[in-house]
Structure formats: structure tokens, C-alpha cells
Amino acid sequence: MREGSALPGAPGAAPVPGFLAKLWALVEDPQSDDVICWSRNGENFCILDEQRFAKELLPKYFKHNNISSFIRQLNMYGFRKVVALENGMITAEKNSVIEFQHPFFKQGNAHLLENIKRKVSAVRTEDLKVCAEDLHKVLSEVQEMREQQNNMDIRLANMKRENKALWKEVAVLRQKHSQQQKLLSKILQFILSLMRGNYIVGVKRKRSLTDAAGASPSKYSRQYVRIPVESGQAMAFSEHNSDDEDGNRTGLIIRDITDTLENATNGLLAVAHTSGRDRETQTALDPGLPICQVSQPNELSCAEPIPPVHINDVSKPNEMGNVAVELHTAQANAPEDPVSVIDSILNENNSGNQNDPLLDREEIQDFLNCIDASLEELQAMLSGKQYSFGSEAFSDVFNPELPALDMNLMETSPGMENIANMEDSTEDLGASERETAGSKGGQEGTESCDSSVLFQNCVLKWNFSSL
């Protein structure tokens, strides 16, 4: 039966949907009462055997055998499943009977079928209409959220820039820290190199001086020391100003003199400073002192660089072991540097007191204190500068062994004239006089040699500061 056709036996009836007409014919068919039929009161219809209904009747009327689809169709037309109640409790169905009911689907009332309508999802137009105030409120909230999002984006960008700047600052600080660590390491290496070299700066010692009668010593004179030497030899040290082309060079001559006395068993160590003008050893000696006199050069510049030292070894044909060793110290024009204060102090001390007699112990001590103060001032000046010298460079500069020695054994010493004079004066002295002079001046000469080495080390340090 198609939708819109009238039921049989009901002429002039309103059109009924096809599903309802088929359902009515199915329930009214007496041949299918064992599968589907009316209830006892005629208000509902019951499906007695669900499996047979799905296999036999559904394909015959609805062209499918899906019981679930049939139940969905019933729900769309308003049919409800009847639940059995007993004493207000839902009772479990003992069989597979399913019962449905509808207010207009009753036995003997076929005319009520036209009142059964299929449910249509009606959309209310009122629900679609949105109030203008609500819409404005939603738009305002969206705008506020956008502003907050923009503010968050700006803050995030600022934080990124600050983070980048902080990382750059951290990198700079790390670089500075690394430079400070390197500088500190170099300073420590420099200090350790000084400690390994056994350098002594600013050590105050008491030095005793002995007057030499008949001589005109300079301000800072040195005494003679008689040191026993094997094979009857004597060593003579003299510092003089050689007569070169410009007359400005100064030198220290170390002479090894063979003792010609037959009974002499000890050598003589004599230190003599000669001036550059006459180049002759001062012969005026004290009766208690041996051989020669030590005198300071007229001018001594602490800022001048010290060139390599030449040691000349010359042997005479008639005398064995007669060696002359000369150490030349050239003067050069040093540029102005931070140690000008030290130079001025030393120049004042040297130029103002060249012709004075021998200084006493207190004046020598004051001079050494002045050198100590000058060294401390130099250290304070250099502490504010940064040097890139390694520990090896410092060790090479402050090496007390003077590695730049030039051993020239074929060159004749320019001070060979003093050797004959010193030999003659040695022959004139007696063994008793030499022993007496050696016992008196042994300790004093040792201290004088230590002070000379210390002063040369100071000169080396001042020359390094002018580089």
C-alpha cells in the first residue's frame, strides 16, 4: 500500500502514510497472529516472535529484514515501547514479546490513523534570532581578547630582546673574566720565575768600607778582597771608561794574573775601577790593602740597555795562565719611559757627589734605600699596564747568568796595559802584607761583590721597563 492511499473498506478516508497502512494491515492479518497481533485490550500491538517477524514478515511488507530499522520508524511516528511493571518494579521479560502503543493506533479505529504524523525536526526561527545586545557583548569580548593577545605579543618581544642583551652581557663578562684569569696567571708565572731565579730586591745590608790612603775614590767605592786561588794566580776586576771614538763607552775588565812569586801559594782578587780619561790604574794604595783600587764610573744611567758582554782571552808567550777578560758596557740613548724618576734620582746622586770622599755606612744605606724606593715606584707604575709576555720571556730577560755572552778569544783586550802594572805591584808586595790585607777585607769584599751583582740586576730590570 502506497502512502496517500485510503485503507480498504474505508471509502472517502483521508490519505494515510504508507508505513502506517502497512503496519495496520500486518496487525489486522489473522494469518500472522502467531507472530504479531493486538493486545488483549486492543490498545497496543505485540510482536510475539522477533526472529520470525524479521525473516518472514518484514521482507514481505517492507522489503528488508532489519528489525532495528522497523523500530526506528515506529519511533519517528510516535510509537513507544511498553515496559511491563509489577508492583511498581520493572519485571524481566520471560519471553521475547515486544509491545508498542500509540494513542491513535487502536484496534477497530482505523480512522484515527490520519492523526498520526511523522515527526519533523522543526527549527524555531525565534531561536535563530540573536539579540543585538548579546552580539555586541560577544564582539566586545573578542576585541578585548585581541588587545590582550597583542599586549602579550609585545611583552614577549621585549623579553626576547632583554634576554638577548643579557646573553651578550654574559658573553662580555665571561671574556673579561677569562682575560683577568690569564693576566693573573701571567703575574703568578712571573712571580714564580723570580722565585726560581732567586732574585733579591730591596734587601738591606750593612756594608763596611775601608779608606784607601793616598787615593781619590769616587762616591761608591769597592774594597779589595784577597781570595786564595789554586796554582798561585790572582784575579783582578776593574771597571773603566775606554778611549773609543766617541769616548762614551764604559767597561768592566776582569783580569787573571799569574803570580810570579815562587813562595806564593794564594792568589789575589783585586777589583779596580779606572776612569776613561787616563785608562791607568790608580797606584796609590793603602799599606794594609793590596794592589789596586775600586772606583765608580763618572756617569751611570740605569735606564740604558746593556749590550752583550765580550769576554776576551789572551795568553802571553812567556807567562801561562795570564788571561784578560773584558766586559764592555755600552751606553745608548734611552727613550723617555716611566722610570725617569729613578734616572733623575740616580743622576743627582752621581753628579753631585763625584768628588766627595768615601761615604760612611749611613750614606751607603740611604743610597740603597733610595734604590729600594725607586724599585717599588717602578713596580707600582708597571702594575697599571698589561703585558703579553709569557713566563719564558720574563725568565730570559731576568736571567742572572747573562745568556748573551760573546766569547771572543782572538781579540786582544784594550786594557792589557793595566796587566803589567798590576803584575809589578804584585811582585812588590810581601806575603805577610797580602795575608793581612786578605784577612781584613775578605768579608767586606764578598759583600761588595754581592752588592755589585744586585745593582746589575736592578739595571737589567730598569732596562726592561723601557722596552
Swiss-Prot record:
Region ranges (Hydrophobic repeat HR-A/B): 128-201
Keyword terms: Activator, Cytoplasm, DNA-binding, Nucleus, Phosphoprotein, Stress response, Transcription, Transcription regulation
GO terms assigned for molecular function: core promoter sequence-specific DNA binding; DNA binding; DNA-binding transcription activator activity, RNA polymerase II-specific; protein homodimerization activity; RNA polymerase II cis-regulatory region sequence-specific DNA binding; sequence-specific DNA binding
SMART domains: HSF
One Gene Ontology CC term in the entry: nucleus
Pfam families: HSF_DNA-bind (PF00447), Vert_HS_TF (PF06546)
Main subcellular localisation: cytoplasm
Function: DNA-binding protein that specifically binds heat shock promoter elements (HSE) and activates transcription. HSF3 binds DNA constitutively only when the C-terminal region is deleted.
Summary of subunit composition and partner proteins: Homotrimer.
UniProt similarity note: Belongs to the HSF family.
Protein's UniProt name: Heat shock factor protein 3
Organism, as annotated: Gallus gallus (Chicken)
Lineage of origin: Eukaryota, Metazoa, Chordata, Craniata, Vertebrata
Protein encoded by which gene: HSF3
